[in-house]
């Protein structure tokens, strides 16, 4: 029998900040490293025949980095800010992450105004729907206003659509018992965003399909 005192606890404060920072560093290091590699090629006198390739690498990686930073500003920024976002603006942020990816995203969110917390939930849910399609497929993100709540839905359909155990734990608000923290923190962050706003988050996973349903009070 497991001792309750030794069971993993949910992170807060510095521990939560460290996990988010680690996630962001992991996301940023690939395009940042590619930019550095391109600059090295430009400086190499023996590789001048590769200048066009180097510039292409730098440009593509810079666009990826800009897209990641813009997304992270909304996905992980302070939810207490008075700033609001339009549906089209949020769709563009998520679309910036799909370039060159295997999964497609159908953004069916109306071009209305969303609070910071609602925007955070929307973009994270859409991102996780695409992340559930490691071998490609189609993801859908939808949102609608009901009398008492904003309802956000996400669906992922593909040949290997699935949730990793770490993601399943995070999406249900459970601590990470084992596995990779980087696979857990963003799903947990979505759960935390929704529940801190007084809402609920439901997730269903079956063969070839994963669905998300969040409700946040208006």
Indicate residue ranges for each PLM-predicted region:
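Conserved catalytic segment of histidine kinase HATPase_c domains, centered on the N-box/ATP-lid region
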Residues: 42-54
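Glycine-rich/acidic phosphate-handling loop/turn and adjacent ATP-lid/helix
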Residues: 148-187
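Short C-terminal beta-strand
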Residues: 209-217
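Conserved short strand/loop->alpha-helix "switch" segment adjacent to the catalytic nucleotide/phosphoryl-transfer site
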Residues: 9-19, 102-130, 134, 177-182
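Conserved ATP-binding N-box helix of the HATPase_c
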Residues: 18-38, 43-45, 117-145, 186-196
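Cytosolic coiled-coil signaling helices that couple upstream sensory modules
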Residues: 1-10
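Glycine-rich ATP-binding loops of the HATPase_c
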Residues: 198-205
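Conserved DHp (HisKA) dimerization/phosphotransfer helix of two-component histidine kinases, i.e.
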Residues: 51-104
């Amino acid at each position: 029998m497991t001792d309750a005192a030794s069971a993993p606890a949910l992170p807060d404060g510095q521990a939560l900040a460290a996990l988010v920072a680690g996630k962001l560093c992991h996301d940023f290091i690939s395009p940042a490293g590619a930019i550095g590699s391109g600059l090295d090629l430009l400086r190499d006198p023996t590789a001048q025949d590769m200048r066009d390739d180097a510039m292409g690498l730098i440009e593509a990686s810079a666009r990826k980095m800009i897209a990641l930073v813009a997304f992270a500003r909304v996905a992980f920024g302070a939810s207490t800010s008075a700033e609001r976002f339009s549906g089209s603006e949020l769709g563009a942020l998520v679309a910036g992450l799909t370039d060159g990816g295997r999964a497609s995203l159908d953004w069916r969110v109306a071009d209305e105004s969303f609070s910071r917390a609602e925007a955070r939930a929307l973009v994270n849910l859409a991102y996780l729907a695409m992340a559930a399609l490691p071998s490609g497929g189609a993801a859908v993100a939808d949102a609608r206003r009901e009398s008492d709540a904003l309802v956000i839905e996400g669906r992922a359909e593909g040949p290997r659509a699935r949730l990793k155990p770490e993601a399943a734990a995070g999406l249900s608000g459970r601590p990470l018992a084992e596995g990779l923290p980087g696979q857990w923190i963003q799903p947990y962050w979505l759960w935390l965003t929704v529940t801190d706003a007084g809402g609920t988050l439901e997730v269903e996973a079956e063969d070839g399909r994963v669905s998300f349903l969040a409700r946040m009070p208006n």
